[in-house]
């Protein structure tokens, strides 16, 4: 029997880049692709590419990779000090976060990571296995509709913390649908 081993450091990079992609998409950015590779001369082992964002990248997208990586390593409960320590390694993310000057960014990012943890983990598994994921794969992990108006509502529901956005509720066998929080 073949025993498969997992490189946890490379899987952490896949989680990191998947979180940038998923949270970026939730915040309205268009993901081109996310890739992981051997570390380059700057120590980067992956990247997430977005189409041009006229207003820039939201600060929660910059912090998402670090927060998801810590969530992967320590579970949902980790200290703000752990984030500060990790941002010492992820200097690009730290520079973007410091430039935003918003003290509420960490709380918003943690909530988004918890809300979208399943899609992040699913996308990270694909990224770890194949080394690259597309924007379409990000949308598939988020289970977004192919129709723009529906996907816009779904993304808004995710930002609001309701995941999934709607489920069928059939009291007495009727065909009623209503939005509810899960």
What is the role of each PLM region?
Residues 2-182:
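Soluble catalytic regions of large protease machineries
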